[in-house]
Amino acid sequence: MSTPSRPFRSPRRARWLVPVLLLLVWLVVGGALGPYAGKLGEVATNDQASFLPRSAESTRVVDAQQAFQQDETLPVIVVWTADGDGDAAVTAHQQAATRSVAGLEGDPGIVGPASPALPSDDGRALQAVVQVEPDLGERLPDVLADIGDAAGQVPGTRAQLAGPAASQADLSDAFAGIDGLLLAVALITVLVILLLVYRSVLLPLVIILSAVFALALSCAIVYALADRDVVRVDGQVQGILSILVIGAATDYALLLTARFREELARHPDRFGAVRAALRDSWGAVVASAATVALGLLALLLSDLTNNRALGPVGAIGIVCSVLSTLTFLPAVLVLLGRAAYWPAKPVRTGDPEAGHRLWHRVAALVDRAPRRIWALSLAALLACAAFAPTLSSKGVPLDEIFVNDTPSVAAQQTLAEHFPGGSGNPAVVIAEADRLDPVLRAARDTRGVASAAPVTDSGRPGAGTPLVVDGRVRIDATLEAPADSDAAKSTVVRLRAAVHEVSGADALVGGYTAQQYDTQETAAEDRTLIVPVVLAIILVILILLLRSLLMPVLLVATVALNFLATLGVSALVFTHVFGFSGTDASVPLYGFVFLVALGVDYNIFLMSRVREEALRHGVREGILRGLTATGGVITSAGVVLAATFAALGVIPLAFLLQIAFIVAFGVLLDTLVVRSLLVPALARDIGAVAWWPGRLGHRTPAGRD
């Protein structure tokens, strides 16, 4: 009698196939796409013109200016002062200064002849303008060094370089470490925190690997899209993407691994533990990611190019973080089992408080005096929020853009000391050529305008035949106040009103100051539009997840209050600790999107667990069990996210430092006060009614006991 053939290998062996394949796929993804994290800078641009509002008057002037440039150029302003004694006269060196830069004509990167050196009214400074190619890229520092060397040959003087080209070089230098330094600081910080949290060797490395794979995939996708001009990347977006992916992927991984550890204590089988962990946590992870991704996509409604750029890029990073967390991480957890926590050993126990002693005490405190807890927490948050209106978001002056000393800022300060405040950054007026005279008179009569002259055939403003292009002329108006000051912005408003009144001139006013003013106004309009959209998106997601109306409203209100409290504290710290006069116009909106979306994340983690426990044990017990079970992991996630955003501070730009502080402090405030005390205490005090009209909302009043 023949023996029947054996069927395919036991399902017990076949079930190993899926995690092994997933692991191999991610190893290939990481190996093949990993280099794109470093290559993203190749498709990034830090051109300041691309930060302008699409519909602003100053942006239309930028487009109109192109026709008046015989060559595409970027100006370098050379300023000479007395060497060793800045108060000494340097007019005797005027001819030598002119000769020093005249000799640069024809050198690599130099466009046309330099302007003659002109003295300041006080006779203590000279300035000349050298035009360079606008797309020098990595060659720009060398070209600037050549200009500096030539200008430095004037005896008895000290030469400094100011203007757009010098500022661009310093900006590129600030972003130089964004590929390696920022990522290294973030990963090392996260690894140290994970080692302290888990007291394990393998699991922190697995979580870091999951985050790195997510970053590699997201950078590769963004690189491909940016290379095809589908999305735009700059240094700020690049830095935020790295931090966002590392922080979000780690947070989601912490939630899943914490649930897996709980399930290992209940299931002897690692496959069953992973299935249970995924079943109970995937909804919260996906909902949390959706709030962040959709909140970021709301930035597409912005009229500011850099805001719109961050939206899709950040959303891609969040999606890749979720994909890695829900595929790579479960595969590795199945393969490692309890060994993932080595040298710790998850043990089976029936004690729900095991491993959560601290958070059991916090839950007991909330249970004993919920009204007192939420009242004190609310009072503290309101006290902090009271300072929020003092935060100025009108932009920062040039000398505050960088948090360290930079050559271009020092040169600009020297220029402002001896020449009209707006020297080197004139307001630019474009008007119909046949209305040149009345427009010129209107500009010169405007309070705050030091001088105004049409651009001539030589390509420079001054006496001579005005350059007419397509029936239009360009007028450069030098302002009395520094170009980055509030006084200069007020002058631009008056100048616009004056030239707009000239009949038939069709005049437009742009230039650096006008760009700053338009950006400030557009940022305010963006906040008015985007903030309610983000809140509505989050509210809808919470309603779908929690199947309630009142609880989502409560959660959105608490995270909004947390944002206002964070702004209040930030206003005090920025002014009295960092010495900033204000923030970039986009900082409050970025802070809102990140803090509100990420703040809701932690409340989603908490309240989805509370709902799960409440359906089994009642509302009151559900709150206590949910807070006890999630307190540790959510706090760890908050610390990780705060630390990763704090890593943005290694880039010496005020914008990123301000974002780093707002998000880091706000996340810690949310995890330690809002999510740990305020929300549980409010839910405990309100009781089952907070879950109306869902199933929990119809529980008996005993749920409040």
From Swiss-Prot:
InterPro entries, A to Z: MMPL_dom, Mycobact_MmpL, SSD
UniProt keywords, alphabetically: Cell membrane, Membrane, Transmembrane, Transmembrane helix
Keyword set includes Transcription: no
Subcellular location: Cell membrane
Membrane topology listed for this record: Multi-pass membrane protein
Transmembrane segments: 16-36, 177-197, 202-222, 237-257, 281-301, 316-336, 373-393, 529-549, 554-574, 587-607, 627-647, 648-668
A Pfam cross-reference name: MMPL
Main location, first listed in the record: membrane
GO CC terms in record: plasma membrane
Record-stated family: Belongs to the resistance-nodulation-cell division (RND) (TC 2.A.6) family. MmpL subfamily.
Name recorded for this polypeptide: Putative membrane protein SCO0839
Species classification: Bacteria, Bacillati, Actinomycetota, Actinomycetes, Kitasatosporales
